[in-house]
């Protein structure tokens, strides 16, 4: 059985990033097997402060990636660690250390980043290391997950009120105070309207969750496709409207048809949101990275970015590429400190 890292051992390494990466790699190499489909091990160590205000303590939480035979059901090491925080009162993540089987220091995936953005502060330190500790990168969470979901801190019973208030703010800010250089064009507003019309607010949809979404994409020939949201009672099986539109994007790409040029996702209250994690991943892995995305920022102003901006590489580290993934069978040995 894998021996967990003790709090004392972790805290002895706090000021030494190489030592922290060594601990994570030690745990990785001690795993009895790799996940069954990727054959790629990832370890995430979370250093946390937990407990009621009068009796706060520190904890080290270990997370490991796991997979079923269908790869869509995989869970990353970071999310595996985060689920363990459910047993603690008021957990605060102080530092995260991540290592993998790769010869490069590999970034957390977009799903991991999105999940972290709801649980950790934007300035939370993340330390990445490669499989032998020879490459180390340190940065803050906000550097790798821009344009987060504006409702990420609300509970279900707060969502509708928050959505209504923020939607009103969006309308007020962009009819009175917005600078024309920051606002959307008439053509972009028409795309926004198409997405808003696609939002399904039927009782069945809103009984599953109080926020619903629609999305629309414009292609280079000025044709527009839109889609609503497909939520499920098993929340993790829900499919966002941008994911549903990816099928149309894929058909046109395969047919060498017109490229997608603009995209927007909106909720029933009128707030435009950047795509969620699964859609961000699909857009950047399969389609052109210069797709323009319309969104409202956290001040409720109309903004645009490119799809590539949704998934920035971490400073001093890499995304896991197909070539790097296939080259990870030589899984590295620990460098002694």
What does each model-found stretch correspond to?
Residues 1-337:
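Zinc-dependent deaminase catalytic domain
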């Amino acid at each position: 059985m894998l021996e967990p890292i003790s709090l004392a051992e972790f805290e002895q390494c706090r000021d030494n990033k190489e030592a922290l990466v060594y601990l994570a790699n030690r745990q990785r190499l001690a795993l009895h097997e790799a996940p069954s489909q990727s054959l790629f091990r990832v370890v995430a160590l979370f250093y946390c402060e937990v407990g009621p205000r009068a009796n706060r303590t520190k904890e080290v939480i270990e997370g490991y990636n796991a997979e079923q035979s269908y790869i869509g059901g995989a869970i990353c090491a970071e999310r595996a660690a985060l689920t363990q925080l459910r047993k603690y009162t008021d957990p605060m993540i102080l530092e995260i250390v991540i290592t993998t089987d790769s010869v490069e220091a590999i970034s957390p995936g977009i799903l991991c980043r999105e999940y972290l953005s709801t649980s950790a502060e934007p300035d939370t330190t993340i330390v990445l290391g490669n499989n032998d500790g020879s490459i180390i990168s340190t940065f803050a969470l906000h550097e790798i997950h821009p344009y987060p979901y504006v409702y990420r801190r609300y509970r279900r019973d707060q969502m509708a009120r928050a959505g209504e208030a923020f939607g009103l703010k969006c309308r007020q800010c962009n009819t009175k105070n917005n600078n024309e250089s920051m606002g959307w064009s008439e053509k972009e507003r028409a795309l926004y309207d198409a997405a808003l019309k696609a939002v399904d607010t039927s009782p069945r949809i809103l009984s599953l969750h109080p926020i619903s979404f629609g999305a629309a994409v414009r292609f280079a020939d000025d044709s527009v496709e839109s889609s609503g949201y497909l939520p499920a009672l098993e929340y993790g099986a829900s499919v966002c409207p941008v994911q549903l539109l990816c099928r149309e994007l894929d058909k046109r790409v395969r047919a060498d048809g017109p490229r997608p040029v603009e995209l927007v996702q909106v909720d029933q209250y009128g707030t435009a949101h950047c795509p969620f994690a699964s859609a961000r991943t699909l857009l950047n892995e399969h389609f052109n990275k210069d797709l323009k995305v319309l969104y409202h920022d956290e001040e409720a102003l109309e903004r645009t970015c490119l799809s590539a901006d949704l998934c920035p590489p971490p400073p001093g580290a890499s995304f896991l590429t197909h070539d790097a993934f296939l080259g990870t069978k030589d899984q590295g040995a620990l460098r002694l400190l």
